[in-house]
């Protein structure tokens, strides 16, 4: 049984959670993407608003491309959205083709204008409208009061980062980082999920290591697993088998392990009693503009600028950051630096490991704010249900806000 990578992470608030269930129905989790207005200045690509339900973003885009007879790479998008949800996001296509008449179940497309091609990351964030069912709503005010006093919610990466139904991405990432390609292949190919199609074939591969049998038994939709198996049969090298995968897939594994370490850093900081909304000497802070953290604009906190920086944090113009470990990330000093070193040491990896990765897997790293400060946060209770509405910057998980509020057992 795979361990939940979020299970042992500390909560920032000590107030009991409201409990409850999310995503009982797709309509319980509504996501609306926000992109910069500048996208619509100039540019000749057609921009559509894609509404989907029970579709992964990539699967929906591939289906749209198939229906109009083009390669899916011709359709641009800014961010991936949850599958078990109702989501609204923008897509671009740089040719004169009308998508509004494309008929796909649970997918609608509306033309909104002309603009520049969309690329991954080219969004400001997302509005969320989320229903949590069967809660104890009277506990909510205390949690929100305490979260406000402590500056917000812990900015943990959500379970989506590690694999929602089969949380192996971070384990594979660590093994790749250590150059243990055979073990990484065993985890990626062999670890079963939670009652997923293909689980029996995975288990059999883990027991037998029989590549030919796996190619017979692995379902066709496990295309990356099958591609690796074919490459191994051809080369006898698990390293070359991984490197045959598309770079975005390889990056998922490394990003997942970076995210796992970042989560451990936040949890350790809470555990040791250090604030997330107040800088310590040696911290690195990120600038904030109009509520959006600018993760590439950072500066170091020293004894001499400590009061000035904490004033900026109180005014909402800066936030304390944590490490996204990589070959050129900016390391903290002082107590925060000690915590970073301990996280790496306890995980059994070093910055050298990041530098030695094959080029397609190499990640520079960076900094990420420790807190989530939802904008326009509102809620209302409807019987035992609570309906939440808020905006989050890109790369921030609504499920991490809800985790602190619900405190799942």
Curated annotation (Swiss-Prot):
GO terms for biological process: tRNA pseudouridine synthesis. Keywords: Isomerase, tRNA processing. Residues 152-373 form the TRUD domain. GO terms for molecular function: RNA binding; tRNA pseudouridine(13) synthase activity. Its EC number is 5.4.99.27. InterPro entries: PsdUridine_synth_cat_dom_sf, PsdUridine_synth_TruD, PsdUridine_synth_TruD_CS, PsdUridine_synth_TruD_insert, TruD_catalytic. The keyword Isomerase applies. Could be responsible for synthesis of pseudouridine from uracil-13 in transfer RNAs. This is Probable tRNA pseudouridine synthase D. It comes from Pyrococcus horikoshii (strain ATCC 700860 / DSM 12428 / JCM 9974 / NBRC 100139 / OT-3). The lineage of its organism: Archaea, Methanobacteriati, Methanobacteriota, Thermococci, Thermococcales. The gene is truD.
């Amino acid at each position: 049984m795979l361990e939940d990578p979020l299970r042992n992470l500390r909560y920032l608030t000590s107030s009991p959670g409201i409990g409850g269930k999310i995503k009982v129905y797709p309509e319980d989790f509504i996501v609306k993407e926000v992109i910069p207005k500048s996208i619509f200045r100039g540019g000749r690509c057609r921009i559509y608003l894609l509404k989907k339900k029970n579709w992964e973003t990539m699967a929906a885009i591939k289906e749209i491309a198939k229906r109009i007879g083009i390669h899916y790479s011709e359709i641009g998008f800014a961010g991936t959205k949850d599958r078990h949800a109702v989501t609204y996001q923008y897509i671009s296509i740089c040719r004169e083709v009308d998508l509004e008449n494309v008929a796909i179940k649970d997918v609608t497309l509306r033309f909104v204008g002309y603009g520049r091609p969309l690329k991954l990351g080219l969004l400001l964030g997302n509005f969320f409208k989320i229903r949590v069912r069967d809660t104890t709503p009277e506990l909510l005010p205390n949690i929100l009061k305490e979260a406000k006093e402590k500056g917000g919610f812990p900015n943990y990466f959500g379970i989506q980062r590690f694999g929602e139904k089969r949380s192996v991405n971070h384990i594979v990432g660590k093994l790749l980082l250590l150059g243990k390609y055979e073990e990484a292949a065993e985890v990626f190919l062999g670890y079963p999920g939670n009652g997923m199609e293909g689980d029996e074939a995975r288990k059999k591969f883990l027991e037998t290591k029989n590549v030919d049998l796996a190619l017979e038994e692995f379902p066709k939709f496990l295309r990356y697993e099958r591609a690796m198996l074919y490459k191994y049969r051809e080369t006898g090298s698990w390293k070359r088998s991984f490197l045959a995968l598309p770079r975005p897939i390889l990056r998922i594994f490394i990003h997942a392990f970076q995210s796992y370490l970042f989560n451990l850093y936040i949890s350790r900081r809470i555990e040791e009693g250090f604030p997330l909304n107040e800088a310590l000497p040696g911290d690195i802070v990120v600038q904030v503009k109009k509520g959006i953290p600018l993760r590439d604009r950072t500066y170091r906190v020293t004894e001499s600028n400590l009061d000035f920086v904490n004033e900026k944090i109180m005014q909402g113009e800066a936030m304390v950051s944590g490490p996204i470990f990589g070959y050129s990330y900016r390391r903290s000093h002082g107590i925060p630096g000690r915590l970073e070193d301990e996280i790496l040491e306890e995980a059994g990896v070093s910055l050298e490991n990041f530098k030695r990765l094959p080029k397609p897997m190499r990640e520079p790293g960076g900094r990420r704010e420790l807190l989530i400060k939802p904008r326009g946060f509102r809620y209302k209770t409807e019987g035992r249900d609570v309906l939440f509405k808020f905006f989050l910057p890109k790369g921030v998980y609504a499920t991490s806000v809800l985790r602190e509020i619900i405190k799942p057992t």
